[in-house]
Amino acid sequence: MKSPFSRFFGGGSKTEPIVKNEVEQAEAVHTAEEVIKLPIDQIVPNRFQPRTIFDDEKIEELSRTIHTHGVIQPIVVRKTSENQYEIIAGERRYRAMKKLQWTEVPAIVRNLTDKETASIALIENLQREELTAIEEAVAYQKLLELHELTQEALAQRLGKGQSTVANKLRLLRLPDEVQQAILQRKISERHARALIAIKDQPLQLEVLQQTVDNDWNVRQLEEQIQAILHPVTDEQESVPKKAKPKRKAISKDVRIALNTIKQSLTMVTKSGITVKTEEEDTEEYYQITVKIPKKKKV
């Protein structure tokens, strides 16, 4: 039988997207193959699985579906030793059946290499919307390494734009703390891409924490980053360069605090309350005086 993902392994057109038909082939051809029952304790997850976090609620939902309707599609495995099988496709089904405490599961056994197993696992998961941007980026990186492809060639074979692949891969340059925030869905991919502009890692992590704590949207984060990287005050704009008084440099964490205060005042103003502010920048401190009328003017 023709190997699944043969075009990814060098045969066929290198520009034709392979994801849809060959992934379907990888699981759908089970009608022509033998489905056997395997002891669930002999099955292990795929070591090439790009997904690092499984949604317990969705696994529970899948468990209820399987309990009611049974397993419509068997999992696909390969034999790795006398009493061990590695999952090629269907880990969510495996986890759901394990949750139901099944002792045996329906499976199709395939004879595949590490390279083929990894590719099927990676591409199967790339079809699913549940992957985080980091998991997707890791999958792209592994496929590039496995098949020694350029980003352009990988994008063509997956039917995606090269910029999509490049933008995802760029996320892997971020510190582990930022990547973990994406994996845990504390920030979005767009948040992470905005953070790339900050080259100073301690500052980058500080802004990350501020983003999570204040629940900033992408636009708010971009405004904060702009203010940090290119701080310009009204006073500085109106005073000629020669007349600028010498001030102590404002630390980056103070800038973040000031921007947060100003952002809060803007929100108060938008709610319909008139707010008067006075700002004073001295050698020792930065003072903001806020005046809120007790009575609304008629």
From Swiss-Prot:
It holds the Pfam family ParBc. Keywords: Cell cycle, Cell division, Cytoplasm, DNA-binding, Septation. Gene3D superfamilies: 1.10.10.2830, 3.90.1530.30. GO terms for cellular component: chromosome; cytoplasm; nucleoid. The keyword Cell division applies. The keyword Ion transport does not apply. CDD domains: SPO0J_N. Residues 152-171 bind DNA. GO terms for biological process: chromosome segregation; division septum assembly; positive regulation of sporulation resulting in formation of a cellular spore. GO terms for molecular function: DNA binding. It is found in: Cytoplasm, Nucleoid. Belongs to the ParB family. Effects nucleoid occlusion by binding relatively nonspecifically to DNA and preventing the assembly of the division machinery in the vicinity of the nucleoid, especially under conditions that disturb the cell cycle. It helps to coordinate cell division and chromosome segregation by preventing the formation of the Z ring through the nucleoid, which would cause chromosome breakage. This is Nucleoid occlusion protein.
